[in-house]
Amino acid sequence: MMLNSDYLNLLDLMQITNANFPIGTFSHSFGIETYIRKDIVFDGDSLIRALLLYMNEQLLHGDLLAIYQIFKLLPKQKINAIWEIDQMINFQGLARETREGQRRIGQQMVKIYNELFDCELLVEYAQRIKDRKSYGNPAVAFALLAMHLKIDLKTALYTHLYSTVAALTQNCVRAIPLGQVKGQKIIHKLKHVYFDDIIDKVFSLDFKTDFCKNIPGLEIAQMEHEDTPVRLFMS
């Protein structure tokens, strides 16, 4: 039986992953706007293909694998290794806009989390960012808070995957444009058809060889976005 505190922790998780949580995700397409401009993404089906590319490459080998690794490191008190993940995931990003966008979102998450929760590691993370010892990353911040809230690993992975994809889908729906109901149908399909496979893949990856491993296509689109004179999104 779940305790009252467990329900409150679950509500906290729902709050921080809500689309209205003010961390700035509404400003980013992470390269998909380039595909929209080139008419590679123009309807619901083509958007799903682009989102699957993002989910199976950058999100899987970056954020989700980082969360998985932090859940392994923190119980062993390997704190310095967690800060190394922040460094690694920042250095591996080739596209400047995407790298800076992730950094801004991560820093905002750390700032707001510290205003809402009493978590020593997040306080330390904020100080490291202030001292320029860390950059700030959404996956690192989320993993630290999820463990503070006693959220299990799989729930944390599914939740981060959902919140990231839902926010990105809503942004792309505005850009194409598609109707809001169509956007919800896309999110629903992604959840029920593809999420299980992606989460299963996380557990089969090796951190040393697979972390931040990407195919070049999406990163090229993200770098091309930097030279786009008229755009809706910062990345």
From Swiss-Prot:
GO terms for molecular function: nickel cation binding. Its main location: cytoplasm. The keyword Cytoplasm applies. It is found in: Cytoplasm. Keywords: Chaperone, Cytoplasm, Nickel insertion. One of its GO terms (cellular component) is cytoplasm. It holds the Pfam family UreF. Required for maturation of urease via the functional incorporation of the urease nickel metallocenter. Belongs to the UreF family. UreD, UreF and UreG form a complex that acts as a GTP-hydrolysis-dependent molecular chaperone, activating the urease apoprotein by helping to assemble the nickel containing metallocenter of UreC. The UreE protein probably delivers the nickel. This is Urease accessory protein UreF. It comes from Ureaplasma urealyticum serovar 10 (strain ATCC 33699 / Western).
